[in-house]
Amino acid sequence: MQNSQAESWHGTTILTVRKGGRVVIGGDGQVSIGQTVIKSNARKVRKLGKGDVIGGFAGATADAFTLFERLEAKLEQYPGQLTRACVELAKDWRTDRYLRRLEAMMIVADKEVSLVLTGTGDVLEPEDGVMAIGSGGNYALAAARALSDSEHDAETIVRRSLEIAADICVYTNRNVTIEALTA
């Protein structure tokens, strides 16, 4: 089994949808190294801080947990200010020699804002309340955008979009974890 940098990015799809006063983040459970499925029920979506922030990650698991811990520290430093906490984390991520090597991306959300954080220092907010990361991210994003105008609620859109991504992306499965917040 090989474990190269490119291979570590395969193995997940994380999607968030903000609709009808709710924000939902969902992720599949597959962890792959190369062409081998290592685990099918990993939990890549969770509540952060005091439960008022939800997040999901794609990339190297240990790196993502390190970033979640750093984000929780920033949330303690800047309570109720998710955007500020994320910008401060992104600054550290870009400038710290140790953090710069971490290979992960994150989607985080609170009742007001949804953000994608990348190792290049990007902190991005979607225009339409929908965004996705990971190997099946583009498939899930397209499906969610198509379903956003329907009568389906945010959780249904996330679940259905992740199922569609799992049907297309070999690094994504149907073991979905969902976290939600009501505005």
Swiss-Prot record:
The Gene Ontology biological process annotation of the record reads: proteolysis involved in protein catabolic process
Give the SUPFAM superfamilies listed for this entry: N-terminal nucleophile aminohydrolases (Ntn hydrolases)
According to its record, what are the GO cellular component terms?
HslUV protease complex; proteasome core complex
Q: Does the keyword Chaperone apply?
A: no
Cystine links in this protein are none
Q: Where in the cell is it found?
A: Cytoplasm
Which residues does the Swiss-Prot or TrEMBL record annotate as the active site?
A: T12
The reaction(s) catalysed by this protein are: ATP-dependent cleavage of peptide bonds with broad specificity
UniProt-annotated binding residues for Na(+): A166, C169, T172
E.C. no: 3.4.25.2
Q: What class of enzyme is it?
A: hydrolase
Q: Name one Pfam family in it.
A: Proteasome
Superkingdom: Bacteria
Q: Which PROSITE patterns does this one have? A: PROTEASOME_BETA_2
Q: Report keywords, A-Z.
A: Allosteric enzyme, Cytoplasm, Hydrolase, Metal-binding, Protease, Sodium, Threonine protease
- Function of the protein: Protease subunit of a proteasome-like degradation complex believed to be a general protein degrading machinery.
What does the sequence similarity comment in the record state about its family? Belongs to the peptidase T1B family. HslV subfamily.
The name this protein carries in UniProt is: ATP-dependent protease subunit HslV
Top-level taxonomy: Bacteria, Pseudomonadati, Pseudomonadota, Alphaproteobacteria, Hyphomicrobiales
